[in-house]
Amino acid sequence: VVGAILLSYVAVFAFGVRTTVIGDSMSPTLVGGQEVLINRLVYNIFEPRMGDVIVFKPNGNENAHTYVKRVVATPGDKVRIMNGILYVNDAPEEFFTDSIANAGIASSEIKVGEDEYFVMGDNPNSSEDSRNANIGNIKKSTIMGKAWFHMAGGTEGLGRIR
């Protein structure tokens, strides 16, 4: 069993898709310059869930850099940011310890459409995400996969992304 696990990790490192986190929008979970491994198959079987860290190209723009953000709302959810607090389906969410300074387009209620996701950086006051009109809700077709493992960087060594 240990050999199979080791072999799978070697296969992922050798053949896995990597991307580099740009900026500090996912701090403290991930830091700028840190590399993450992407599971490209998981969303062919399952739907992204609230709390997943995903990798995507905004609006499907292949020339854009990859974005790494956390799913905070899924299809059918209603999202709004009021008084620095994220509300999903009228319930406050505790993803963020700091008050959210810029509500962006989420200052008014946003309905997340079918096959769409509302994403934010873990450091929302330094993040370009679904609150920005030029990004908005993320279509499932633009998601490259789930960021599941981070390389050494920041204060952490190798490890799973939570």
Predicted features along the sequence, with ranges:
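Hydrophobic alpha-helical transmembrane segments in multi-pass membrane proteins
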Residues: 4-8, 80
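Aromatic-capped interface at the extracytoplasmic side
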Residues: 8-26
